Amino acid sequence: MSLLDYTAVELAAKIKAGETTATEAMEAVIAQIEKSEDELNCYVTFDKEKALAAAKKADEDIKAGKLTGPLAGVPFAIKDNMCTEGMLTTCSSKILGNFVPTYTADAVERLQNAGAVIIGKTNMDEFAMGSTTETSAFGATKNPRNPEHVPGGSSGGSAAAVAANECFAALGSDTGGSIRQPASYCGVVGLKPTYGTVSRYGLIAYGSSLDQIGPLCKDVTDCATIMEAIAGKDDKDSTSIGRDDYSFTNALVDDVKGMKIGIPRDYFGEGLDPEVKEAVLNAAKVLESKGAIVEEFDLSLVEYAIPTYYTIAAAEASSNLERFDGVKYGYRTKEYEGLHNMYKKTRSEGFGPEVKRRIMLGSFVLSSGYYDAYYLKALRVKALIKKAFDEAFAKYDVILGPVAPTTAPKLGSSLSDPIKMYLGDIYTISVNLAGLPGLSVPCGKDKNGLPIGLQLIGDCFKENNIIRAGYAYEQARGRFE
Protein backbone atom coordinates (compact mmCIF):
# COMPACT_ATOMS: atom_id res chain seq x y z
CA MET A 1 0.00 0.00 0.00
CA SER A 2 1.42 3.37 -1.07
CA LEU A 3 1.69 6.15 1.51
CA LEU A 4 -0.76 8.19 -0.59
CA ASP A 5 -3.41 5.46 -0.31
CA TYR A 6 -3.82 6.07 3.43
CA THR A 7 -6.71 8.12 4.71
CA ALA A 8 -5.92 11.15 6.88
CA VAL A 9 -6.71 9.21 10.09
CA GLU A 10 -4.64 6.20 8.97
CA LEU A 11 -1.69 8.47 8.13
CA ALA A 12 -1.91 10.25 11.50
CA ALA A 13 -1.78 6.85 13.25
CA LYS A 14 1.29 5.81 11.20
CA ILE A 15 3.05 9.09 12.07
CA LYS A 16 2.18 8.69 15.75
CA ALA A 17 3.52 5.12 15.73
CA GLY A 18 6.79 6.33 14.17
CA GLU A 19 6.23 4.29 10.99
CA THR A 20 6.43 7.39 8.79
CA THR A 21 6.80 11.16 9.19
CA ALA A 22 4.99 14.33 8.19
CA THR A 23 7.95 15.15 5.94
CA GLU A 24 7.72 11.81 4.11
CA ALA A 25 3.97 12.31 3.67
CA MET A 26 4.49 15.84 2.35
CA GLU A 27 7.22 14.66 -0.04
CA ALA A 28 4.83 12.01 -1.40
CA VAL A 29 2.13 14.65 -1.91
CA ILE A 30 4.57 17.04 -3.60
CA ALA A 31 5.71 14.28 -5.98
CA GLN A 32 2.07 13.63 -6.89
CA ILE A 33 1.40 17.35 -7.39
CA GLU A 34 4.42 17.66 -9.68
CA LYS A 35 3.22 14.62 -11.63
CA SER A 36 -0.43 15.60 -12.21
CA GLU A 37 -0.93 19.30 -11.41
CA ASP A 38 -0.13 20.58 -14.92
CA GLU A 39 -3.10 18.61 -16.21
CA LEU A 40 -5.54 18.95 -13.29
CA ASN A 41 -4.89 22.51 -11.98
CA CYS A 42 -6.14 21.80 -8.44
CA TYR A 43 -4.07 24.52 -6.72
CA VAL A 44 -3.98 28.30 -7.04
CA THR A 45 -1.17 28.68 -4.49
CA PHE A 46 1.43 26.00 -3.82
CA ASP A 47 4.92 26.70 -2.44
CA LYS A 48 6.98 23.51 -2.31
CA GLU A 49 9.64 24.86 0.04
CA LYS A 50 7.15 26.37 2.51
CA ALA A 51 5.11 23.15 2.55
CA LEU A 52 8.23 21.07 3.26
CA ALA A 53 9.38 23.48 5.96
CA ALA A 54 5.94 23.28 7.63
CA ALA A 55 6.09 19.45 7.55
CA LYS A 56 9.60 19.41 9.07
CA LYS A 57 8.44 21.79 11.81
CA ALA A 58 5.48 19.45 12.48
CA ASP A 59 7.87 16.49 12.83
CA GLU A 60 9.97 18.45 15.34
CA ASP A 61 6.87 19.40 17.35
CA ILE A 62 5.55 15.81 17.28
CA LYS A 63 8.92 14.52 18.49
CA ALA A 64 8.99 17.13 21.28
CA GLY A 65 5.44 16.24 22.35
CA LYS A 66 4.10 19.69 21.42
CA LEU A 67 1.89 18.45 18.57
CA THR A 68 -0.41 15.64 19.66
CA GLY A 69 -3.68 16.34 17.82
CA PRO A 70 -5.68 13.68 15.95
CA LEU A 71 -4.39 14.96 12.59
CA ALA A 72 -0.78 15.59 13.62
CA GLY A 73 1.47 15.75 10.56
CA VAL A 74 -1.25 15.21 7.94
CA PRO A 75 -0.94 17.37 4.76
CA PHE A 76 -4.17 19.31 4.07
CA ALA A 77 -5.36 21.61 1.28
CA ILE A 78 -7.53 24.70 1.89
CA LYS A 79 -10.09 26.19 -0.48
CA ASP A 80 -8.91 29.61 -1.63
CA ASN A 81 -11.79 31.55 -0.05
CA MET A 82 -10.50 30.98 3.50
CA CYS A 83 -8.03 33.51 4.84
CA THR A 84 -4.54 32.20 5.62
CA GLU A 85 -2.14 34.62 7.28
CA GLY A 86 0.84 35.35 5.04
CA MET A 87 -0.48 33.14 2.21
CA LEU A 88 -2.19 34.43 -0.94
CA THR A 89 -6.01 34.20 -0.73
CA THR A 90 -7.60 35.04 -4.08
CA CYS A 91 -11.11 33.52 -4.18
CA SER A 92 -9.91 32.54 -7.68
CA SER A 93 -10.61 36.11 -8.80
CA LYS A 94 -8.49 38.72 -10.55
CA ILE A 95 -9.81 41.33 -8.11
CA LEU A 96 -8.07 39.53 -5.19
CA GLY A 97 -5.11 38.33 -7.22
CA ASN A 98 -2.59 39.98 -4.86
CA PHE A 99 -4.44 39.71 -1.52
CA VAL A 100 -2.42 38.31 1.41
CA PRO A 101 -4.49 38.26 4.65
CA THR A 102 -3.10 39.32 8.02
CA TYR A 103 -5.10 36.67 9.90
CA THR A 104 -6.22 33.04 9.53
CA ALA A 105 -9.81 31.73 9.29
CA ASP A 106 -11.04 30.12 12.51
CA ALA A 107 -11.67 26.73 10.84
CA VAL A 108 -8.14 26.66 9.38
CA GLU A 109 -6.65 27.65 12.74
CA ARG A 110 -8.55 24.85 14.49
CA LEU A 111 -7.37 22.41 11.83
CA GLN A 112 -3.76 23.47 12.43
CA ASN A 113 -4.26 23.12 16.18
CA ALA A 114 -5.31 19.51 15.50
CA GLY A 115 -1.93 19.02 13.81
CA ALA A 116 -2.70 19.49 10.12
CA VAL A 117 0.04 20.81 7.83
CA ILE A 118 -1.14 23.18 5.09
CA ILE A 119 0.05 22.37 1.56
CA GLY A 120 -1.54 25.30 -0.28
CA LYS A 121 -4.79 26.85 -1.52
CA THR A 122 -7.10 25.09 -3.96
CA ASN A 123 -8.80 26.37 -7.09
CA MET A 124 -12.52 27.17 -7.04
CA ASP A 125 -15.25 28.91 -8.99
CA GLU A 126 -14.68 32.65 -8.68
CA PHE A 127 -16.07 33.80 -5.30
CA ALA A 128 -17.65 30.31 -5.05
CA MET A 129 -20.14 31.22 -7.79
CA GLY A 130 -20.42 28.19 -10.03
CA SER A 131 -20.81 24.44 -10.05
CA THR A 132 -17.91 23.35 -12.27
CA THR A 133 -14.71 25.20 -11.15
CA GLU A 134 -14.55 26.70 -14.64
CA THR A 135 -15.25 30.32 -13.63
CA SER A 136 -11.85 30.64 -11.90
CA ALA A 137 -9.58 33.45 -13.09
CA PHE A 138 -6.73 30.91 -12.93
CA GLY A 139 -8.19 28.38 -15.36
CA ALA A 140 -10.47 25.38 -14.96
CA THR A 141 -9.73 22.42 -12.70
CA LYS A 142 -10.19 18.99 -14.32
CA ASN A 143 -11.69 15.84 -12.85
CA PRO A 144 -8.98 13.27 -11.91
CA ARG A 145 -11.41 10.45 -12.80
CA ASN A 146 -11.55 11.76 -16.38
CA PRO A 147 -9.80 15.05 -17.25
CA GLU A 148 -12.31 15.72 -20.05
CA HIS A 149 -14.94 16.28 -17.35
CA VAL A 150 -15.45 18.93 -14.66
CA PRO A 151 -14.73 18.17 -10.98
CA GLY A 152 -17.85 20.04 -9.86
CA GLY A 153 -17.85 23.22 -7.89
CA SER A 154 -17.38 25.52 -6.34
CA SER A 155 -14.96 23.47 -4.18
CA GLY A 156 -13.74 21.57 -7.24
CA GLY A 157 -10.05 22.13 -6.55
CA SER A 158 -10.37 20.65 -3.05
CA ALA A 159 -12.38 17.62 -4.23
CA ALA A 160 -10.06 16.98 -7.18
CA ALA A 161 -6.95 17.31 -4.99
CA VAL A 162 -8.30 14.64 -2.60
CA ALA A 163 -9.29 12.33 -5.48
CA ALA A 164 -5.90 12.79 -7.18
CA ASN A 165 -3.90 12.18 -3.96
CA GLU A 166 -2.56 15.74 -4.14
CA CYS A 167 -3.51 16.01 -0.45
CA PHE A 168 -4.85 13.66 2.21
CA ALA A 169 -7.92 15.81 2.90
CA ALA A 170 -9.15 19.35 2.31
CA LEU A 171 -11.51 22.06 3.50
CA GLY A 172 -14.24 23.39 1.23
CA SER A 173 -17.26 25.64 1.62
CA ASP A 174 -20.88 24.91 0.72
CA THR A 175 -23.45 27.60 -0.14
CA GLY A 176 -25.77 25.54 -2.35
CA GLY A 177 -23.97 22.22 -2.72
CA SER A 178 -20.37 23.31 -3.24
CA ILE A 179 -18.89 20.55 -1.04
CA ARG A 180 -21.35 17.73 -1.75
CA GLN A 181 -21.59 18.07 -5.54
CA PRO A 182 -17.82 18.04 -6.28
CA ALA A 183 -17.46 15.20 -3.76
CA SER A 184 -20.04 13.28 -5.81
CA TYR A 185 -18.37 14.07 -9.15
CA CYS A 186 -14.86 13.17 -7.92
CA GLY A 187 -15.78 10.10 -5.86
CA VAL A 188 -14.79 11.41 -2.42
CA VAL A 189 -16.68 12.11 0.83
CA GLY A 190 -17.95 15.61 1.60
CA LEU A 191 -19.96 17.03 4.50
CA LYS A 192 -21.86 20.29 4.74
CA PRO A 193 -22.50 20.82 8.49
CA THR A 194 -25.54 22.41 10.13
CA TYR A 195 -25.41 26.19 9.64
CA GLY A 196 -23.49 27.76 12.54
CA THR A 197 -21.55 24.62 13.53
CA VAL A 198 -18.27 25.75 11.94
CA SER A 199 -17.22 29.39 12.25
CA ARG A 200 -17.38 31.54 9.11
CA TYR A 201 -14.77 33.94 10.52
CA GLY A 202 -12.14 34.34 7.80
CA LEU A 203 -14.33 32.81 5.09
CA ILE A 204 -14.76 35.36 2.30
CA ALA A 205 -18.53 35.66 2.12
CA TYR A 206 -20.75 34.76 -0.84
CA GLY A 207 -24.19 34.17 0.71
CA SER A 208 -23.83 34.85 4.43
CA SER A 209 -27.02 33.06 5.50
CA LEU A 210 -26.08 29.95 3.49
CA ASP A 211 -22.26 29.57 3.57
CA GLN A 212 -20.76 26.80 5.69
CA ILE A 213 -17.25 25.28 5.84
CA GLY A 214 -16.80 21.51 5.83
CA PRO A 215 -14.40 18.65 4.97
CA LEU A 216 -13.64 16.82 1.73
CA CYS A 217 -11.85 13.55 2.38
CA LYS A 218 -11.42 9.87 1.51
CA ASP A 219 -13.89 8.27 3.91
CA VAL A 220 -16.51 8.94 6.58
CA THR A 221 -14.04 8.30 9.43
CA ASP A 222 -11.86 11.16 8.16
CA CYS A 223 -14.98 13.29 7.81
CA ALA A 224 -16.05 12.81 11.45
CA THR A 225 -12.49 13.35 12.74
CA ILE A 226 -12.03 16.58 10.77
CA MET A 227 -15.44 17.82 11.95
CA GLU A 228 -14.36 17.37 15.58
CA ALA A 229 -11.29 19.47 14.79
CA ILE A 230 -12.97 22.40 13.01
CA ALA A 231 -16.37 22.70 14.76
CA GLY A 232 -16.91 24.93 17.77
CA LYS A 233 -18.45 28.16 19.04
CA ASP A 234 -16.61 31.27 17.90
CA ASP A 235 -17.38 34.71 19.33
CA LYS A 236 -15.87 36.30 16.20
CA ASP A 237 -18.80 34.92 14.14
CA SER A 238 -22.24 36.17 15.20
CA THR A 239 -23.91 33.20 13.46
CA SER A 240 -21.78 30.62 15.29
CA ILE A 241 -23.86 28.35 17.53
CA GLY A 242 -22.65 26.56 20.66
CA ARG A 243 -23.55 22.87 20.78
CA ASP A 244 -23.74 20.40 23.65
CA ASP A 245 -22.03 17.66 21.69
CA TYR A 246 -19.12 17.86 19.24
CA SER A 247 -18.31 14.12 19.41
CA PHE A 248 -18.83 13.25 15.75
CA THR A 249 -16.55 10.19 15.88
CA ASN A 250 -18.99 8.57 18.34
CA ALA A 251 -21.26 8.04 15.32
CA LEU A 252 -18.74 5.78 13.57
CA VAL A 253 -20.79 2.70 14.40
CA ASP A 254 -21.76 0.02 11.89
CA ASP A 255 -25.35 -0.17 13.12
CA VAL A 256 -28.43 1.30 11.45
CA LYS A 257 -30.95 -1.18 12.86
CA GLY A 258 -34.24 0.64 13.42
CA MET A 259 -33.01 3.88 11.79
CA LYS A 260 -35.87 5.46 9.82
CA ILE A 261 -34.79 6.61 6.37
CA GLY A 262 -37.09 8.61 4.10
CA ILE A 263 -36.71 8.69 0.31
CA PRO A 264 -38.41 11.74 -1.28
CA ARG A 265 -40.33 10.75 -4.42
CA ASP A 266 -39.72 14.32 -5.65
CA TYR A 267 -35.97 13.55 -5.93
CA PHE A 268 -36.48 10.64 -8.33
CA GLY A 269 -38.61 12.18 -11.07
CA GLU A 270 -37.88 13.69 -14.46
CA GLY A 271 -34.31 14.83 -15.12
CA LEU A 272 -32.57 12.22 -12.95
CA ASP A 273 -30.12 10.04 -14.90
CA PRO A 274 -31.26 6.36 -14.76
CA GLU A 275 -27.77 5.19 -13.74
CA VAL A 276 -27.69 7.68 -10.85
CA LYS A 277 -31.19 6.61 -9.78
CA GLU A 278 -30.24 2.92 -9.80
CA ALA A 279 -27.01 3.46 -7.81
CA VAL A 280 -28.72 5.59 -5.14
CA LEU A 281 -31.66 3.20 -4.72
CA ASN A 282 -29.24 0.26 -4.51
CA ALA A 283 -27.47 2.10 -1.67
CA ALA A 284 -30.84 2.48 0.08
CA LYS A 285 -31.34 -1.29 -0.26
CA VAL A 286 -27.94 -1.88 1.37
CA LEU A 287 -28.99 0.17 4.41
CA GLU A 288 -32.36 -1.59 4.46
CA SER A 289 -30.58 -4.98 4.45
CA LYS A 290 -28.66 -3.82 7.54
CA GLY A 291 -31.87 -3.16 9.46
CA ALA A 292 -32.84 0.40 8.50
CA ILE A 293 -36.53 1.12 7.89
CA VAL A 294 -36.74 2.69 4.42
CA GLU A 295 -39.90 4.44 3.16
CA GLU A 296 -40.85 6.73 0.30
CA PHE A 297 -42.57 10.03 1.05
CA ASP A 298 -43.47 13.36 -0.57
CA LEU A 299 -41.23 16.34 0.21
CA SER A 300 -43.06 19.41 -1.07
CA LEU A 301 -41.62 22.64 -2.52
CA VAL A 302 -38.54 21.00 -4.11
CA GLU A 303 -39.30 22.73 -7.43
CA TYR A 304 -39.15 26.14 -5.72
CA ALA A 305 -35.69 25.61 -4.21
CA ILE A 306 -33.66 26.83 -7.21
CA PRO A 307 -35.43 30.19 -7.81
CA THR A 308 -35.52 30.77 -4.04
CA TYR A 309 -31.81 30.05 -3.65
CA TYR A 310 -30.67 32.12 -6.63
CA THR A 311 -32.74 35.08 -5.41
CA ILE A 312 -31.41 35.01 -1.83
CA ALA A 313 -27.81 34.06 -2.68
CA ALA A 314 -27.54 36.69 -5.42
CA ALA A 315 -29.00 39.37 -3.14
CA GLU A 316 -26.48 38.57 -0.40
CA ALA A 317 -23.62 38.33 -2.92
CA SER A 318 -24.36 41.75 -4.42
CA SER A 319 -24.12 43.22 -0.92
CA ASN A 320 -21.05 41.21 0.19
CA LEU A 321 -19.07 41.97 -2.96
CA GLU A 322 -19.52 45.75 -2.62
CA ARG A 323 -16.37 45.76 -0.47
CA PHE A 324 -14.16 44.89 -3.45
CA ASP A 325 -13.65 48.29 -5.02
CA GLY A 326 -9.89 48.75 -5.46
CA VAL A 327 -9.46 51.14 -2.52
CA LYS A 328 -7.89 49.24 0.40
CA TYR A 329 -6.78 45.92 -1.09
CA GLY A 330 -6.91 43.79 -4.20
CA TYR A 331 -6.78 44.78 -7.86
CA ARG A 332 -7.13 48.41 -8.96
CA THR A 333 -7.47 49.54 -12.57
CA LYS A 334 -4.43 51.38 -13.94
CA GLU A 335 -6.13 54.26 -15.76
CA TYR A 336 -9.21 56.08 -14.49
CA GLU A 337 -10.80 59.51 -14.22
CA GLY A 338 -12.14 60.21 -10.75
CA LEU A 339 -13.24 57.95 -7.91
CA HIS A 340 -16.53 56.74 -9.44
CA ASN A 341 -14.79 55.77 -12.68
CA MET A 342 -12.10 53.93 -10.68
CA TYR A 343 -14.77 51.85 -8.90
CA LYS A 344 -16.53 51.07 -12.17
CA LYS A 345 -13.41 50.09 -14.13
CA THR A 346 -11.87 48.12 -11.25
CA ARG A 347 -14.99 46.02 -10.76
CA SER A 348 -15.59 45.61 -14.51
CA GLU A 349 -12.03 44.39 -15.05
CA GLY A 350 -11.68 42.49 -11.77
CA PHE A 351 -14.84 40.36 -11.74
CA GLY A 352 -15.58 37.54 -14.18
CA PRO A 353 -18.85 37.08 -16.15
CA GLU A 354 -20.62 34.73 -13.68
CA VAL A 355 -19.88 37.00 -10.70
CA LYS A 356 -21.15 40.03 -12.63
CA ARG A 357 -24.29 38.10 -13.59
CA ARG A 358 -25.08 37.31 -9.95
CA ILE A 359 -24.27 40.84 -8.72
CA MET A 360 -26.69 42.25 -11.32
CA LEU A 361 -29.38 39.72 -10.40
CA GLY A 362 -28.90 40.50 -6.70
CA SER A 363 -29.04 44.24 -7.26
CA PHE A 364 -32.24 43.79 -9.27
CA VAL A 365 -34.09 41.72 -6.64
CA LEU A 366 -33.10 44.19 -3.91
CA SER A 367 -34.06 47.27 -5.92
CA SER A 368 -37.02 49.49 -5.08
CA GLY A 369 -40.24 48.05 -6.48
CA TYR A 370 -38.90 44.50 -6.79
CA TYR A 371 -37.76 43.85 -3.20
CA ASP A 372 -41.20 42.60 -2.06
CA ALA A 373 -41.95 40.73 -5.28
CA TYR A 374 -38.70 38.75 -5.31
CA TYR A 375 -36.50 38.94 -2.22
CA LEU A 376 -39.19 38.94 0.50
CA LYS A 377 -41.15 36.26 -1.36
CA ALA A 378 -37.99 34.12 -1.54
CA LEU A 379 -37.50 34.48 2.23
CA ARG A 380 -41.09 33.29 2.79
CA VAL A 381 -40.56 30.25 0.55
CA LYS A 382 -37.28 29.53 2.37
CA ALA A 383 -39.26 29.35 5.64
CA LEU A 384 -41.78 26.98 4.01
CA ILE A 385 -38.96 24.72 2.78
CA LYS A 386 -37.59 24.57 6.33
CA LYS A 387 -41.08 23.71 7.60
CA ALA A 388 -41.39 20.88 5.04
CA PHE A 389 -38.10 19.40 6.28
CA ASP A 390 -39.20 19.80 9.91
CA GLU A 391 -42.31 17.76 9.13
CA ALA A 392 -40.21 15.09 7.40
CA PHE A 393 -37.77 14.84 10.31
CA ALA A 394 -40.67 14.33 12.71
CA LYS A 395 -40.97 10.92 10.96
CA TYR A 396 -37.45 10.12 9.73
CA ASP A 397 -33.90 10.14 11.12
CA VAL A 398 -32.29 10.57 7.70
CA ILE A 399 -33.45 11.62 4.23
CA LEU A 400 -31.72 9.76 1.39
CA GLY A 401 -31.38 10.83 -2.25
CA PRO A 402 -28.96 11.69 -5.04
CA VAL A 403 -26.45 14.54 -4.80
CA ALA A 404 -26.76 15.56 -8.45
CA PRO A 405 -29.04 14.57 -11.36
CA THR A 406 -26.09 13.34 -13.46
CA THR A 407 -22.44 12.41 -13.17
CA ALA A 408 -19.78 15.04 -13.99
CA PRO A 409 -20.53 16.91 -17.25
CA LYS A 410 -17.88 17.49 -19.90
CA LEU A 411 -15.71 20.60 -19.64
CA GLY A 412 -17.36 23.61 -21.28
CA SER A 413 -20.85 22.12 -21.52
CA SER A 414 -22.23 24.01 -18.50
CA LEU A 415 -20.68 27.43 -19.15
CA SER A 416 -22.61 27.76 -22.41
CA ASP A 417 -25.90 27.13 -20.57
CA PRO A 418 -25.98 28.73 -17.07
CA ILE A 419 -29.58 27.57 -16.43
CA LYS A 420 -28.50 23.96 -16.99
CA MET A 421 -25.68 24.51 -14.49
CA TYR A 422 -28.09 25.99 -11.93
CA LEU A 423 -30.50 23.04 -12.34
CA GLY A 424 -27.65 20.68 -11.43
CA ASP A 425 -27.96 21.93 -7.84
CA ILE A 426 -31.61 20.91 -7.44
CA TYR A 427 -30.99 18.22 -4.77
CA THR A 428 -28.43 20.15 -2.70
CA ILE A 429 -29.79 23.71 -2.54
CA SER A 430 -32.76 23.08 -0.23
CA VAL A 431 -30.38 21.68 2.41
CA ASN A 432 -28.64 25.09 2.60
CA LEU A 433 -31.92 26.99 2.59
CA ALA A 434 -33.06 24.95 5.60
CA GLY A 435 -29.63 25.14 7.34
CA LEU A 436 -29.39 21.33 7.50
CA PRO A 437 -26.36 18.99 7.41
CA GLY A 438 -25.77 16.94 4.25
CA LEU A 439 -23.26 14.18 3.50
CA SER A 440 -22.10 12.93 0.09
CA VAL A 441 -20.73 9.37 -0.04
CA PRO A 442 -19.66 7.57 -3.27
CA CYS A 443 -22.16 4.82 -4.14
CA GLY A 444 -21.14 3.66 -7.60
CA LYS A 445 -20.04 4.64 -11.10
CA ASP A 446 -21.78 5.14 -14.42
CA LYS A 447 -20.93 3.22 -17.61
CA ASN A 448 -18.08 5.67 -18.31
CA GLY A 449 -16.50 5.12 -14.89
CA LEU A 450 -17.58 8.48 -13.45
CA PRO A 451 -18.52 8.45 -9.73
CA ILE A 452 -22.06 8.75 -8.38
CA GLY A 453 -22.77 10.28 -4.97
CA LEU A 454 -25.34 9.27 -2.36
CA GLN A 455 -26.72 12.20 -0.33
CA LEU A 456 -27.72 11.70 3.29
CA ILE A 457 -29.55 14.64 4.89
CA GLY A 458 -30.06 15.08 8.63
CA ASP A 459 -32.07 17.37 10.86
CA CYS A 460 -30.32 20.41 12.36
CA PHE A 461 -27.46 19.38 14.68
CA LYS A 462 -28.03 15.70 13.81
CA GLU A 463 -24.81 15.17 11.85
CA ASN A 464 -24.28 11.97 13.82
CA ASN A 465 -27.30 10.36 12.15
CA ILE A 466 -25.94 10.90 8.65
CA ILE A 467 -22.39 10.01 9.71
CA ARG A 468 -23.69 6.73 11.17
CA ALA A 469 -25.70 5.93 8.03
CA GLY A 470 -22.78 6.89 5.77
CA TYR A 471 -20.32 4.83 7.80
CA ALA A 472 -22.60 1.77 7.80
CA TYR A 473 -23.06 2.02 4.03
CA GLU A 474 -19.31 2.46 3.55
CA GLN A 475 -18.57 -0.68 5.61
CA ALA A 476 -20.86 -2.71 3.34
CA ARG A 477 -19.53 -1.10 0.14
CA GLY A 478 -15.82 -1.48 0.91
CA ARG A 479 -13.05 0.83 -0.29
CA PHE A 480 -14.09 3.03 -3.22
CA GLU A 481 -11.53 2.90 -6.01
UniProtKB/Swiss-Prot annotation:
UniProt-listed GO biological process terms: translation
Recorded superkingdom: Bacteria
PROSITE patterns per the UniProt record, alphabetical: AMIDASES
GO cellular component assignments: glutamyl-tRNA(Gln) amidotransferase complex
Heme as UniProt keyword: no
Region described as Disordered: spans on this chain: 136-157
NCBIfam families: gatA
HAMAP family, sorted: GatA
Family: Belongs to the amidase family. GatA subfamily.
This protein's name: Glutamyl-tRNA(Gln) amidotransferase subunit A
Lineage of producing organism: Bacteria, Bacillati, Bacillota, Clostridia, Lachnospirales
